[in-house]
């Protein structure tokens, strides 16, 4: 957590890339990025561990690198996405499987 006057791109070594629809820059190294309009911030909990904020937004445009886009879909095996857990913990997708969703009868 840095104060607002600190350039977190500089700290992280990532490259800022101008967005098309919003003021905030996006991360050039990211293969998939979303530009969003803020709808609501919901505070969850207090100052105790596990507290935080739920940020709700509307995607106004998304960017997908051609390297990970195949047959009209994002190729998860090529993308190799990371997920953020809690604290300093992250995860990788290690197994992909499909479950056919049942269609509700009319």
Task: Identify the meaning behind each predicted range.
Residues 1-106:
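Active-site-proximal mixed secondary-structure blocks
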């Amino acid at each position: 957590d840095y104060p607002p006057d600190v350039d977190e791109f500089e700290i992280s070594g990532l490259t800022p890339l101008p967005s098309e629809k919003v003021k905030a820059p996006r991360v050039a190294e990211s293969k998939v990025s979303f530009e969003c309009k803020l709808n609501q911030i919901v505070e969850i909990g207090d100052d105790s561990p596990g507290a935080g904020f739920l940020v709700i937004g509307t995607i106004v445009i998304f960017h997908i690198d051609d390297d990970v886009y195949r047959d009209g879909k994002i190729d998860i095996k090529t993308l190799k996405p990371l997920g953020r857990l809690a604290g300093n913990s992250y995860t990788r997708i290690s197994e992909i499987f499909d479950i056919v969703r049942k269609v509700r009868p009319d």
